[in-house]
Amino acid sequence: MGSAVTSDHSAKGGATALMPYDEVLRGYEPVLGLETHVELGTRSKMFCSCATTFGAEPNTQVCPVCLALPGALPVVNSAAVESAIRLGLALNCSIAEWCRFARKNYFYPDMPKNYQISQYDEPLCYDGYLDVTVDTPEGPREFRIGIERVHMEEDTGKTSHVGGADGRIHGAEYSTVDYNRAGIPLLEIVTKPIEDAGEWAPQVARAYVRELRDLIRALGISDVRMEEGSLRCDVNVSLKPRGSTEWGTRTETKNVNSLRSIERAVRHEIERQGGVLSAGGRVVQETRHFQESTGTTVAGRSKEEAQDYRYFPDPDLVPVAPDREWVEQLRATLPELPSAKRRRLKAEWNLTDKELQDLVNANAVDLVEQTVAAGAPPAEARKWWLNDLSRRATETGVELSELPITPAQVARVVELVAEGSLTNKLARQVVDGVLAGEGEPDEVVEARGLRVVSDDAALGAIVDQAIANNADAAEKVRNGKIAAVGALVGAVMRETKGQADAGRARQLILERLGVSG
């Protein structure tokens, strides 16, 4: 489990090689902290009525509030508060009886007010947990990740640096700022220190963010698309000497944008910090950036402490005091959460952990479940959504759930195959027709003339012609070379353009040749 040697710089100023992962673990225990930002799927921003449509023309979804023009006052989006409470409940958090917003002061071009409205010492949700499972050689192992807090805040604008390396400001010719994103509602979920992950620290970090993503998706409060920035993760890593009660200095790797990258970033930081310490250096508290191309982190700026932001209560916003009856109503409306659904479906459908996770990763659990409810066997429903339909969704750039085909229609296609009316090849053509808006599966079958030729009289005539046209293959079959029947079946399928029942065609061929197969 060693690592290629790379170099970085320690506090002593020299280049430092990475320390092999296993060697680091012999002397140190990794301590993790994960801060996850989730863009909520509300129709308007956190403190104004501007739209939140992703991909709109730059600076077209802005107003005096999100541009911080003098005299513009914020108003809290109640839908965002509701989403925050629902997530807090799903994460087993306590919901504060009283919370308030604070100003987080810093200067950066993407923050027009020169402060961000956030929550500091009085968050809306606190003291929860999320259970995650990691596959190990000894079998699945469960970890309970403590949740320190879930708090509300507003997003920043988006800065783009043109002409620099890797989109960084260094060497850029110029920079642009799009304020469409400024003010979009964010939830920040902060874990308690994760000290018991040990050698599985990278996998635990990945499993936590994956489970959190699935949970948020089930709640329907965000699309949690990491590639679009609606789910962003900051990874804090430090090393604690084995047997010590004192933590080491932590680094924060910002905005890691995929599950795989989260795992790689944690592993690299453990190896990098181990190398720094083994060389006699000290780890610098700083912000770092993950480089996807190399799988490494690079130094950014020194890491601020809370006092650097000069938090103080926002005088323009009144405190939020969620009504207890409202909170309980929200608790009662929570959907079946992913962990409970996985346990149920795994037992009902007899799935392996990998098969189940494939469904989760494709966001296909609900679609498959609805297809099964419409009458399809679980294995067939899973096959269609994960294979053919997933490919079509990828080709058209949409989510599976956005494809113009319903679970009931998929179930009908499966039924037509099972009853022998369609082959798998013909079934794919039927699905193409449904996706093209040609109607229900049965209507597509009739309009395209796709039903399997299974009538013995019609099929028998085609079989006789195939035998006559392929005398050599027929003779081989008569002489006991049963494999040669494939050529005759192929001839039948070509003649019928794939619409023959291949199994029945094979049976008729063998009968006519006087061979048992």
UniProtKB/Swiss-Prot annotation:
Transferase keyword on record: no
GO molecular function annotation: asparaginyl-tRNA synthase (glutamine-hydrolyzing) activity; ATP binding; glutaminyl-tRNA synthase (glutamine-hydrolyzing) activity
Entry keyword annotation includes tRNA-binding: no
InterPro entries: Asn/Gln-tRNA_amidoTrfase_suB/E, Asn/Gln-tRNA_Trfase_suB/E_cat, Asn/Gln_amidotransferase, Asn/Gln_tRNA_amidoTrase-B-like, GatB, GatB_Yqey_C_2, Gln-tRNA_amidoTrfase_suB_CS, Gln_synth/guanido_kin_cat_dom
Catalytic activity line of the entry: L-glutamyl-tRNA(Gln) + L-glutamine + ATP + H2O = L-glutaminyl-tRNA(Gln) + L-glutamate + ADP + phosphate + H(+); L-aspartyl-tRNA(Asn) + L-glutamine + ATP + H2O = L-asparaginyl-tRNA(Asn) + L-glutamate + ADP + phosphate + 2 H(+)
A single GO BP: glutaminyl-tRNAGln biosynthesis via transamidation
Listed EC numbers: 6.3.5.-
Keywords: ATP-binding, Ligase, Nucleotide-binding, Protein biosynthesis
Role, per record: Allows the formation of correctly charged Asn-tRNA(Asn) or Gln-tRNA(Gln) through the transamidation of misacylated Asp-tRNA(Asn) or Glu-tRNA(Gln) in organisms which lack either or both of asparaginyl-tRNA or glutaminyl-tRNA synthetases. The reaction takes place in the presence of glutamine and ATP through an activated phospho-Asp-tRNA(Asn) or phospho-Glu-tRNA(Gln).
Complex formation: Heterotrimer of A, B and C subunits.
Family the UniProt entry places it in: Belongs to the GatB/GatE family. GatB subfamily.
Protein name: Aspartyl/glutamyl-tRNA(Asn/Gln) amidotransferase subunit B
Gene that specifies this protein: gatB
